[in-house]
Amino acid sequence: MQELYADVIIDISHEAIDRAFQYVIPEKLVSQIRTGCQVNIPFGRGNTMRTGYVIGISDRTEYDRTKMKTIDSVCTEGIAAPGRLVALAGWIKENYGSTMINALQTVMPVKKTVRSVVVRYVALAVDETDEIEYKYMKRNARAKLRLLRTLKGENIIPMSKVTGELGVSSATVKAMQEEGVITVTEDSCYRKVTSDAVRKEAFMAPDIELNDIQMSIINEFQDDVDKDVHRTYLLHGVTGSGKTEVYVQCIRRVIEQGKQAIVLIPEIALTYQTIKYFTRYFGERVTVVNSRLSSGERYDQFERAKKGDVDVVIGPRSALFTPFERLGLIIIDEEHESSYKSDNPPKYHARETAIERARLEGASVILGSATPSVESYKKAMSGEFRLWTMDERVSDRKMADTSIVDLREELRRGNRSIISDELAEDITDRLSRHEQIMLFINKRGFNSFVSCRN
């Protein structure tokens, strides 16, 4: 058998070793090692055991075979990154000046396996129960009788109900199991990341009549999907113009093609309302991924995505790296938001990274915003992106009245307050009607304080 070699990135973030080291793949591990998997390797003069990521496999080497080291083992708890995400990590490294290990760890939000949640079930193992029931009654075995009668009606019940609601001890269950009356089975299940209230909304979406502009956009997207054309679209729509309805319909077209979609939102705080909205259309085939989930919950959602158990994943930046096998569409809502730019190395931008992942996967990207970023708008105007414009609100809803007040005029009139006379009058008017008011203070903007004196 021809010897194979693996290019391995060491799990140490340091520029001095920010390159691939080639190791021999032992024959016993050939079937287990593939691009993206984690391996244990001897490293350095002392052959200290380190973890590394395989980023390539070859049957050739430029090094002296007698001086090469051999991979020790495959990490049993490690998670392999799909090959395309490894390629994306390489792109992040080159474009954002990070180390390869940092880039790999970025595209792998879940790095270790987590023990599955195991649910135990109790079921009847016999068809005829009359004699057994009579025997339990004669012995006054109340707990056994209670469980037997419950199983006659439900056939199979979770162990949690047996020991909780029915008050049957584990010893009693074991005794009935030894008698051959019942069987106990185990089944792994995914951790729930959405509330019961959200799950009740499944497929409860109202019938919405799309307007001509929405239909025109959706039909164009459908034509591109049918022709296997993949591009980046900028959906420039005013607030309330129905961009979310367009997202839903475009996702439907992608799912009909047997593919999957990622929806990025700028803030975790928007997760609840977003997941609730999409659940109405896609039921439990939609899930959420964000940093508020436990490691087990995140692991389960990525496993669901990898196995094709979900069609839509919603979340902030990190959701971009969901390991879908058949990714067809990435949607970035409020694409102008600064939160899509990572503050930690590698300081990647989710918008640009999404476009690159779409290129690698053969997918499309929709950037949505009422106020697009200058970069995206320029690319749309130059033809690099396809521009969709929605300049009217749905159902003839009017735009909110907006007033711009020049505080320099207020100063000339002697008003040195941060509240203009017009704003003070409007506040007084609304309070007199027992209405509520929201005042936004610019403390998180580019300039936290502005005072114009002339």
Predicted regions and their residues:
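Conserved interdomain linker/interface between the two RecA-like ATPase lobes of SF2 helicase motors
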Residues: E356-G368, S373-R444, S448-R453
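Accessory, non-ATPase domains that flank or precede helicase/AAA+ motor cores in DNA-metabolism machines
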Residues: M1-S369, M381-R397, L431-S432
